[in-house]
């Protein structure tokens, strides 16, 4: 990535080829080559990027075409899919650029390479902020569904959801520009780390509160007949909350190594053990791209309506309810 994340080496670097000047000496100390940078073939990044793009485009098409999916939660999922597409597109384009540079088929100026590097890093930054904000928006949506069920449709309308999505992407665009402007400052990394842990803590608090309330509520209505439809509605709300909890868990699992990488760059850039960890940067990028691949699978697994819409789109069927 940019020099604020990964110290520059003797040749132009991009995320997929991040180098650390101290790594060779650390490797010699280890004696086993553990600190050597992990090399991942460009084909892996390209394959993950293509699969992720196709999956997330399918998610967006499904929500747009099926009127039954025109609800705030699914619009937020569309926005999350767009964020996943952005990170996959960024890494794929960057991989292609790295291949071109290494093949010597084109001679590119260092200034141009650095400029493109900042753009790709900015795209990843935008994707990260968008993912966090959309996950938080979905968490709030589920929170309102459970705690204010009777007023949900007046509190969280489609218009409000779309306005919130637009606001999220405007803020993400501003963050992307700021990332390029202050690309040499470590404060960019500090801000990303702070946002990540603050949002995770906030979402964790919301979900704990939701599940504790839902558990108590289910216990209270367990003995009552479900004639009024309260139990099925509560079950539907909880199913949505469980789905988003799974998404949040996968997000944390896939992004946490990358953020630990950033933390170590800030706190112990010369420590041999920290250098060993940061030498596996490419592995953390693969995990990030895997998150973009896994998310659509979670949508399909947890939503029968979305799964059926996927089948109808892929099979070219016309029996779809368009709203």
Swiss-Prot record:
Glycans are attached at residues 2, 16, 28. One of its GO terms (cellular component) is cytoplasm. A lipid is attached at residue 315 (S-palmitoyl cysteine). It is found in: Cell membrane. Residues 1-37, 101-118, 182-186, 269-277 are extracellular. The keyword Zinc-finger does not apply. One of its GO terms (molecular function) is peptide hormone binding. GO terms for biological process: adenylate cyclase-activating G protein-coupled receptor signaling pathway; adenylate cyclase-modulating G protein-coupled receptor signaling pathway; circadian regulation of gene expression; homoiothermy; locomotor rhythm; regulation of blood pressure; regulation of feeding behavior; regulation of heart rate. Brain. The chain crosses the membrane at residues 38-63, 76-100, 119-140, 161-181, 187-210, 246-268, 278-301. Residues 64-75, 141-160, 211-245, 302-323 are cytoplasmic. The keyword Iron-sulfur does not apply. CDD domains: 7tmA_MC3R. Keywords: Biological rhythms, Cell membrane, G-protein coupled receptor, Glycoprotein, Lipoprotein, Membrane, Palmitate, Receptor, Transducer, Transmembrane, Transmembrane helix. It is a multi-pass membrane protein. Its main location: membrane. It holds the Pfam family 7tm_1. Belongs to the G-protein coupled receptor 1 family. Receptor for MSH (alpha, beta and gamma) and ACTH. This receptor is mediated by G proteins which activate adenylate cyclase. Required for expression of anticipatory patterns of activity and wakefulness during periods of limited nutrient availability and for the normal regulation of circadian clock activity in the brain. PANTHER family: G-PROTEIN COUPLED RECEPTOR. This is Melanocortin receptor 3. The gene is Mc3r.
């Amino acid at each position: 990535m940019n020099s604020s994340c990964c110290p520059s080496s003797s040749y132009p670097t991009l995320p997929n080829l991040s180098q650390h000047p101290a790594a060779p000496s650390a490797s010699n100390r280890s004696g086993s080559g553990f600190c050597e940078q992990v090399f991942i073939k460009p084909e892996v990044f390209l394959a993950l990027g293509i699969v992720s793009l196709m999956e997330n485009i399918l998610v967006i098409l499904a929500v747009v075409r099926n009127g039954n999916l025109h609800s705030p939660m699914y619009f937020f999922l569309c926005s999350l899919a767009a964020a996943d597409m952005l990170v996959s597109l960024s890494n794929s384009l960057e991989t292609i650029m790295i291949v071109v540079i290494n093949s010597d088929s084109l001679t590119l100026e260092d200034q141009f390479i650095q400029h493109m590097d900042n753009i790709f890093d900015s795209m990843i930054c935008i994707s990260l902020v968008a993912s966090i904000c959309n996950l938080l928006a979905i968490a709030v949506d589920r929170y309102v569904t459970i705690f204010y069920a009777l007023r949900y449709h007046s509190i969280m309308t489609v218009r409000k959801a779309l306005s919130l999505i637009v606001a999220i992407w405007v803020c993400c665009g501003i963050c992307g520009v700021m990332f390029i402007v202050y690309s040499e400052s470590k404060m960019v990394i500090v801000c990303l780390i702070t946002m990540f842990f603050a949002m995770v803590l906030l979402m964790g608090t919301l979900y704990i509160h939701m599940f504790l309330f839902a558990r108590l509520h289910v216990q209270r209505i367990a003995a009552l007949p479900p004639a009024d439809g309260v139990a099925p509605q509560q079950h539907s709300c909880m199913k949505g909350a469980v789905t988003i909890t799974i998404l949040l868990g996968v997000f944390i699992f896939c992004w946490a190594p990358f953020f630990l990488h950033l933390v170590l760059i800030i706190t112990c850039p010369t420590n041999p053990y920290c250098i060993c960890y940061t030498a596996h940067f490419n592995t953390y990028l693969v995990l990030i791209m895997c998150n973009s691949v896994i998310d659509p699978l979670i949508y399909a697994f947890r939503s029968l309506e979305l799964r059926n819409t996927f089948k109808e789109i892929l099979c070219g069927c016309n029996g779809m309810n368009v709203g």
